[in-house]
Amino acid sequence: MILQVQPAKLIKRYKRFLADIELNCGEETTIHCANTGAMKGCAEPDDTVWYTTSTNTKRKYPFSWEITQSQDDHFICVNTLRANQLVEEALHLDLIKELSGFNELKREVKYGNENSRVDFLATYNNAPDTYIEVKSVTLLESGHGYFPDAVTTRGQKHLRELMDMVAQGHKAVLLFAVLHSGINDISAASHVDPIYAKLLKEARLAGVEIIAYKAGFSLQLGELDVKLVEKIPFIER
């Protein structure tokens, strides 16, 4: 995925979906932030914000916060909408070997008993249907990656739905899209959401497959190339 981006300096994030930035010209403006999480370590004052500009002239906030370049020089994709796009791109490029060979890939398919939509449903000729839930990972603490960065009842529901798919004879995958250049392994954040961590352990024992792929970032002349490039370990802590 290639994004046309421009840099700015972060002043502060607030109201979840908004942040104030200082443009290179010195002007201050408000930017849209497509992230409802805590964004711990991803939104410190004076971090560099890389943003895209919408062509929709009716948008109140034409700039979208895509990437944080932290003061210790990590790249972090904070636009959570990009996770599914990156996974879809990687699946079609056959970069996620555990899920290769599908005939069809469908998005946002209704499933389960709790009125959910799975991120992707992959169908195969000689293998079970595969239900894939994608989660974006940006929380780095003490050299390790964690999910979630805030309590997520929605994420808890998705784990129950995935376990139900396994019980019905399907394949179920929880795919962590690791969008922080400093993360090299990932674990459940039991210190953030102990219920989620407990359900994740139950899901793994029930047969839900857990996969984590890390994004690579390349920035040249205002073009930012982001793609999932490396499998990293999921570690139970």
UniProtKB/Swiss-Prot annotation:
What the entry lists under Pfam families is as follows: SfsA, SfsA_N
InterPro entries in alphabetical order: SfsA, SfsA_C, SfsA_N
GO molecular function, one example?
A: DNA binding
Q: Do you know which HAMAP family this protein is assigned to?
A: SfsA
So what family is this one in? Belongs to the SfsA family.
* Protein name as annotated: Sugar fermentation stimulation protein homolog
Species name: Colwellia psychrerythraea (strain 34H / ATCC BAA-681) (Vibrio psychroerythus)
